[in-house]
From Swiss-Prot:
Physiological role: Acts as a RAC1 guanine nucleotide exchange factor (GEF).
Protein name as it appears in the record: Rho guanine nucleotide exchange factor 6
Keywords: Cell projection, Guanine-nucleotide releasing factor, Phosphoprotein, SH3 domain
One of the record's GO cellular component terms: lamellipodium
Pfam families (alphabetical): betaPIX_CC, CH, PH, RhoGEF, RhoGEF67_u1, RhoGEF67_u2, SH3_2
InterPro entries with a match to the protein in the record: AlphaPIX_SH3, CH_dom, CH_dom_sf, DBL_dom_sf, DH_dom, GDS_CDC24_CS, GEF6/7_CC, PH-like_dom_sf
Assembly information from the UniProt record: Interacts with PAK kinases through the SH3 domain. Interacts with GIT1. Component of cytoplasmic complexes, which also contain PXN, GIT1 and PAK1. Interacts with BIN2. Identified in a complex with BIN2 and GIT2. Interacts with PARVB. Interacts with PARVG; the guanine nucleotide exchange factor activity of ARHGEF6 is essential for PARVG-induced enhancement of cell spreading.
A GO molecular function held by the record: guanyl-nucleotide exchange factor activity
Gene that produces this protein: Arhgef6
C-alpha cells in the first residue's frame, strides 16, 4: 500500500474524511482536493489533540480562509515536534510530497497516544495494512503477517469468533455500514485489512472502523453459551446473564419513574387546569394511572425475583403470571390512545403553553406526545430484552421455557395492540369526518362503536364480493365502503339489530371465518372476515346483542324460518313435560303466525289445501305431520343404534310434541281474538289476496291486470330498490357536477383575470409609445 492509500484509509477510519461515493482511482489527487481547504486537517488535529484548534472556518470561500485553516493545523502539529510543510505547498499542490511526509509523521507521533483513543491500536497506518473493504477505496494488501496473527488470535479465543467492544460512537454513512454506540458488543464476522471490519450487532450485519473498538479478552468476555461451543463457559454465561438481568431491572425502574413523573408533574396539574373539559381530560388520560401503578408492581415483582439465587430465578414465570394484567392494561391503553392524540391535536397550543409553564422544554407538546407513546415503545422493548436474556441463559435453567413463552406472549400482545390502534384510528376517522350519502340522524347519535372491522360481503345469491366496513352499535349495524378516491367513506346501508338472525357458516358449509345475516327486514348477506380473531369477535358481539328475550332464539341453526319461529317461542316458556303445551306469558297477536315470505310467489300455492290435509290426517297418525315439516339438519352423524331408537318411541314423541306446539299456538291465538272455536286457525294466505293493478307500458298502452299480494309486494320491492339506486346515482352525479362547476368557475375567473392584465399591459405600452 502506498502512502497516499494509507493516509486515505487512516483519515476515513478516524471519521474526519467522508468516504468517497465511488472507488478512488488516484488517491493522491483525492487527497489534494480533500485537504486543500484545510477543514479535514483541522478536524484531524482536534481529533488527535482535542482543543488544539478552537475555531476554524467550516466553509472557506476564499484563499485566505483556506490558508488560515492550514496554519491552524500546522500550529497544532508544532506540539508534536514533527517537520511541517508550507501552507502554499498544500494549497497550490506544487510540493505535495512534504504534505504527505508531515501527515505520516503525525500518524507515527500519535500512534502511542491513540491506544487510549477511538483509533486504538488499529488507528495507526502501520496497523492499516490493507485496503478498506467499504467499497470506496480499493487498495492491495502489504502485511499478511499481522492478518495471520489476528486469525490465530481469533482461533485461540474459541470457535474462530472475535468479539469486540465499541469504545466510541460511530454513525453509518452508507447502507452497508453499521452504526454502533459506546459499549456495544459486536461479534466480528469478517476481518479485512485496511481498517474496516464486518460484524453483527442486534441481528444486523455491517462494516465498522476497526480502530473504534477494542477486542474483549477471553478473561473478561461475557459470552453466551450458545455463541461458543467446545469449552466451559459457565462463569462467562453467569456473568453476562447477570448483566442482562440487571439491565432489565434498571430500564424497568427508569420506565416506571418516567411514567410516575409524567403523572405527577403534568397530568394531575392539568386536571385542575381549565384548558380541557372533563370529557377531554378523561380521553387524554385514559387508564394511564392504572398502567403507572401496574408498572410499579411489576418492578417490585422483578426485584423480588432477582433476590433469589440465579438457578431459582423465575423472571419468565413472573411475567407470565402478570400477562393477563399486561393484556388488559395495554389493550385498553391502545384503544384509547387515538382519542388522546385527537385531544392533543385539537388543543395543541393550550397544552404546549401549559407544559412549558410546568417546566417542560420547548416545544412542550412534544414532551407530552412522546411521553404518552412510551408504553408502546416499552412493550416492543420487552421482546428484545427477553430475547437477549434467553440467549445468555442455559437450556437447563428452570426458567428457560417460561422465558420462551413470555417472548411469544409479548410478540402476540404487541401485534394485537398495533392492530387495535389502527382500528381505533380508523373508527375515529369515520366518526369525525362526514360520510358521503349518509341517511338519517348523525352517526354520533347512535352511541359508542362496539366493534368495527373490514369485511368482504355477498348479497343473497350474488357471487360478486364487495369490501365493506362494518360498524356495530347497540341498535344497528352500519355498512360503509371506501370512496372511489380513497378520500373518505360512503354509506351503503344499515341493518337493525332487532329481528336480525345470525348463523355461523364455518360449521354448516365448511367455510372458515364466515357467517350470514338474515331477517324479515333484510336480504341474506354472507360475511367473510379477514381472520379468525375478527370472526370470533363478531360472533360474540352479535350473539350478545341478538340473543335475548326479544330475539326469540334467532341464533338457532335451522334452515326453516317457520320451524325456527315456533321453536324459538318454546324456548322462552316455563319448564314443562315433554308433551305439555307451553305457557304463553308475553302478549300474542295473530301476526306472530304470519309465514315468512316465500323464495318465489308460486311457493305458497296450495298452502290451504296442504294445511287442511295435514290437520285432518294428524288425528290418525302423528307421523303424517312430520312429512310436511321441514327436514332438520343434523349436527352429527347418528350411529345405527341411535337410528333404531330414533325410529321408535323417540320419533313418535318428538312428532307429537311438535303437533302439540302448533295446536297450542292456534288455541292461544283464538283466545286472544276472543273466539273459542275449535276450527282451523285463521291464516293469512297472501296468494289468495288479489289486487287490481293498472300499468302503463313503454308504448303508452294502459293495461289492467289482477295480481296476487305476493307478486305485488315483490314488484314494489324491486321498484323501490331501483329507485334507491337511481337516487344514489343522481346524488353522486349532482356532487360531481357541482364540483366541476366550481372548478370551471375558478378557471374562468383565472382566465378573465389574466386577460384583463394583458389588456391593461397592452394599453399602458401603447400609451407610453404615443408619449
Amino acid at each position: 500500500m502506498n502512502p497516499e492509500e494509507r493516509l486515505v484509509t487512516w483519515l476515513i477510519s478516524l471519521g474526519v474524511l467522508e468516504s468517497p461515493k465511488k472507488t478512488v482511482c488516484d488517491p493522491e489527487e483525492f487527497l489534494k482536493s480533500s485537504l486543500k481547504n484545510g477543514v479535514v486537517l483541522c478536524k484531524l488535529i482536534n481529533r488527535l489533540l482535542p482543543g488544539s484548534v478552537e475555531k476554524y472556518c467550516l466553509e472557506p470561500q476564499t484563499e485566505a480562509d483556506c490558508i488560515d485553516n492550514i496554519n491552524d493545523f500546522l500550529k497544532g502539529c508544532a506540539t508534536l515536534q514533527v517537520e511541517v510543510f508550507e501552507p502554499d505547498d498544500l494549497y497550490s499542490g506544487a510540493n505535495f510530497s512534504k504534505v504527505l511526509n508531515t501527515l505520516l509523521a503525525v500518524n507515527k507521533a500519535t500512534e502511542d497516544q491513540l491506544s487510549e483513543r477511538p483509533c486504538g491500536r488499529s488507528s495507526s497506518l502501520s496497523a492499516a495494512t490493507s485496503s478498506q473493504t467499504n467499497p470506496q477505496v480499493a487498495v492491495p494488501s502489504t502485511a499478511p503477517e499481522q492478518h495471520s496473527e489476528e486469525k490465530a488470535e481469533m482461533t485461540e479465543n474459541g470457535s474462530h469468533q472475535l468479539i469486540v467492544k465499541a469504545r466510541f460512537n460511530f454513525k453509518q454513512t452508507n447502507e452497508d455500514e453499521l452504526s454502533v454506540c459506546k459499549g456495544d458488543i459486536i461479534y466480528v464476522t469478517r476481518v479485512e485489512e485496511g481498517g474496516w471490519w464486518e460484524g453483527t450487532l442486534n441481528g444486523r450485519t455491517g462494516w465498522f472502523p476497526s480502530n473504534y473498538v477494542r477486542e474483549i479478552k477471553p478473561s473478561e468476555r461475557p459470552l453466551s453459551p450458545k455463541a461458543i461451543k467446545g469449552f466451559d463457559t459457565a462463569p462467562l454465561t453467569k456473568n453476562y446473564y447477570t448483566v442482562v438481568l440487571q439491565n432489565i431491572l434498571d430500564t424497568e425502574k427508569e420506565y416506571a419513574k418516567e411514567l410516575q413523573s409524567l403523572l405527577v408533574t403534568y397530568l394531575r396539574p392539568l386536571q385542575s387546569n381549565n384548558n380541557l373539559s372533563t370529557v377531554e381530560f378523561t380521553c387524554l388520560l385514559g387508564n394511564f394511572e392504572e398502567v403507572c401503578t401496574f408498572q410499579q408492581t411489576l418492578c417490585q415483582a422483578l426485584e423480588e425475583c432477582s433476590k433469589f439465587p440465579e438457578n431459582q430465578h423465575k423472571v419468565g414465570g413472573c411475567l407470565l403470571n402478570l400477562m393477563p394484567h399486561f393484556k388488559s392494561m395495554y389493550l385498553a391503553y391502545c384503544a384509547n390512545h387515538p382519542s388522546a392524540v385527537n385531544v392533543l391535536t385539537q388543543h395543541s397550543d393550550d397544552l404546549e403553553r401549559f407544559m412549558e409553564n410546568q417546566g417542560a422544554s420547548s416545544p412542550g407538546i412534544l414532551i407530552l406526545t412522546t411521553s404518552l407513546s412510551k408504553p408502546f415503545m416499552r412493550l416492543e422493548k420487552y421482546v428484545t430484552l427477553l430475547q437477549e436474556l434467553e440467549r445468555h441463559m442455559e437450556d437447563t435453567h428452570p426458567d428457560h421455557q417460561d422465558i420462551l413463552k413470555a417472548i411469544i406472549a409479548f410478540k402476540t400482545l404487541m401485534g394485537q395492540c398495533q392492530d387495535l390502534r389502527k382500528r381505533k384510528q380508523l373508527e375515529l376517522q369515520i366518526l369525525s369526518e362526514p360520510i358521503q350519502a349518509w341517511e338519517g340522524d348523525d352517526i354520533k347519535t347512535l352511541g359508542n362503536v362496539i366493534f368495527m372491522s373490514q369485511v368482504v360481503m355477498q348479497h343473497g345469491a350474488c357471487e360478486e364480493k364487495e369490501e365493506r366496513y362494518f360498524l356495530l352499535f347497540s341498535s344497528v349495524l352500519i355498512m360503509l365502503s371506501a370512496s372511489p378516491r380513497m378520500s373518505g367513506f360512503m354509506y351503503q346501508g344499515k341493518i337493525p339489530i332487532a329481528g336480525m338472525v345470525v348463523n355461523r357458516l364455518d360449521e354448516i358449509e365448511g367455510s372458515d371465518c364466515m357467517f350470514e345475516i338474515t331477517g324479515s327486514t333484510v336480504e341474506r348477506i354472507v360475511v367473510h372476515c379477514n381472520n379468525n380473531q375478527d370472526f370470533q369477535e363478531w360472533m360474540e358481539q352479535l350473539n350478545r346483542l341478538t340473543k335475548g328475550p326479544t330475539s326469540c332464539g334467532s341464533l338457532s341453526k335451522t334452515s326453516s324460518s317457520s320451524c325456527s319461529t315456533h321453536s324459538s317461542f318454546s324456548s322462552t316458556g316455563q319448564p314443562r313435560g315433554p308433551l305439555e303445551p307451553p305457557q304463553i306469558i308475553k302478549p300474542w297477536s295473530l301476526s306472530c303466525l304470519r309465514p315468512a315470505p316465500p323464495l318465489r310467489p308460486s311457493a305458497a300455492l296450495g298452502y290451504k289445501e296442504r294445511m287442511s290435509y295435514i290437520l285432518k290426517e294428524s288425528s290418525k297418525s302423528p307421523k303424517t305431520m312430520k312429512k310436511f315439516l321441514h327436514k332438520r339438519k343434523t349436527e352429527r352423524k347418528a350411529s345405527e343404534e341411535e337410528y333404531v331408537i330414533r325410529k321408535s318411541t323417540a320419533a313418535l314423541e318428538e312428532d307429537a310434541q311438535i303437533l302439540k306446539v302448533i295446536e297450542a299456538y292456534c288455541t292461544s291465538a283464538s283466545f286472544q281474538q276472543g273466539t273459542r272455536k275449535d276450527s282451523v286457525p285463521q291464516v293469512l294466505l297472501p296468494e289468495e289476496e288479489k289486487l287490481i293493478i293498472e300499468e302503463t307500458r313503454s308504448n303508452g298502452q294502459t293495461i289492467i291486470e289482477e295480481k296476487s299480494l305476493v307478486d305485488t309486494v315483490y314488484a314494489l320491492k324491486d321498484e323501490v330498490k331501483e329507485l334507491k339506486q337511481e337516487n344514489k346515482k343522481m346524488k353522486q352525479c349532482l356532487e360531481e357536477e357541482l364540483k366541476s362547476r366550481k372548478d370551471l368557475e375558478k378557471l374562468v375567473r383565472k382566465l378573465l383575470k389574466q386577460t384583463d392584465e394583458c389588456i391593461r399591459s397592452e394599453s399602458s405600452s401603447k400609451t407610453s409609445i404615443l408619449q
